[in-house]
C-alpha cells in the first residue's frame, strides 16, 4: 500500500509540474507579439503554405510573424517564362494567403542574376542582346510585375545580390550588358509606380 501511495503521489507531483511547465510555455508571447509592435518580422515562404502542404510550418508563420517574403514564386523565371507572357498564378496564391492571414507581403525579387527569365539576355538566335534591348526588357518586366501586385505587395527587393562578398560588382549579365547603372535603372523603374 505504501508503494502505491508513493507512486500515486509521485505521479500527481509530476503531472502538476508538467501542467505548470506547459501552462508557462503557453504564456510566452510570440515573436510577432513581442517584436511586431516595432517592425515587420517574417519569413520567406513558398507556395507550399498556401497550398496546404506544410500545415506545421503554416501554423508557425501564422503565429510568429506579421510579414512574409515570396521566396521563389515572384522571381522572373517563374512569373515571366516567355517574352510576352506572364504567369502570376503562384505569386497570386501567396498574395491571397497573405491577405487572408493578415500578413504584410514583400515581393522578391525584380532583378537577380540567379533566376531571371531564361530569355532575358539573348535574342532568338542565342546571341546576347544590346544594352538598349536589355534595358527595355528589364523595364517591361518590372513595370508588369509591380503593376500586377500594386496594392498587394508593401515593398520589393528590387535588385538582389548585385555585389560580391568582397564588395565588387557581381559580373552578372545585367552588369556586363548594361553596366553598373542597371541597379539605378531598376530602382527608377520600380519607383515609377
Where are these regions (language model features)?
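Bacterial Sec-dependent N-terminal signal peptides
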Residues: 1-24
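Residues at the starts of beta-strands that form the adenosine-phosphate
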Residues: 3, 40, 104
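Generic alpha-helix initiation/capping and coil-helix boundary signal
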Residues: 7-12, 36, 91, 183
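Short, motif-level signal for alpha-helix interfacial/capping segments enriched in acidic residues
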Residues: 13, 49, 137
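Short, structurally constrained coil/turn elements
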Residues: 13, 35-37, 61, 149, ...
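Acidic-and-aromatic substrate-binding clefts and catalytic sites of carbohydrate-active enzymes
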Residues: 21-22, 44-57, 76-89, 163-168
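Boundary/entry segment of secreted carbohydrate-active catalytic domains
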Residues: 21-67, 71
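Substrate-binding cleft and catalytic face of glycoside hydrolase catalytic domains
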Residues: 28-29, 63, 67-81, 90-193
Amino acid at each position: 500500500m505504501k508503494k502505491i501511495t508513493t507512486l500515486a503521489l509521485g505521479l500527481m507531483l509530476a503531472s502538476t509540474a508538467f501542467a505548470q511547465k506547459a501552462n508557462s510555455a503557453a504564456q510566452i508571447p510570440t515573436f510577432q507579439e513581442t517584436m511586431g509592435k516595432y517592425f515587420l518580422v517574417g519569413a520567406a515562404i513558398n507556395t507550399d503554405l498556401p497550398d496546404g502542404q506544410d500545415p506545421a510550418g503554416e501554423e508557425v508563420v501564422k503565429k510568429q510573424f506579421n510579414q512574409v517574403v515570396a521566396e521563389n514564386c515572384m522571381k522572373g523565371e517563374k512569373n515571366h517564362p516567355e517574352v510576352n507572357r506572364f504567369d502570376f498564378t503562384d505569386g497570386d496564391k501567396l498574395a491571397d494567403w497573405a491577405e487572408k492571414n493578415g500578413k504584410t507581403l514583400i515581393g522578391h525579387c525584380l532583378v537577380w542574376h540567379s533566376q531571371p527569365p531564361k530569355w532575358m539576355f539573348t535574342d532568338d538566335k542565342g546571341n546576347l542582346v544590346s544594352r538598349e534591348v536589355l534595358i527595355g526588357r528589364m523595364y517591361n518586366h518590372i513595370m508588369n510585375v509591380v503593376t500586377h501586385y500594386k496594392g498587394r505587395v508593401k515593398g520589393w527587393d528590387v535588385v538582389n545580390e548585385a555585389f560580391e562578398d568582397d564588395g565588387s560588382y557581381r559580373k552578372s549579365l545585367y552588369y556586363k550588358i548594361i553596366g553598373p547603372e542597371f541597379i539605378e535603372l531598376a530602382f527608377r523603374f520600380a519607383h515609377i509606380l
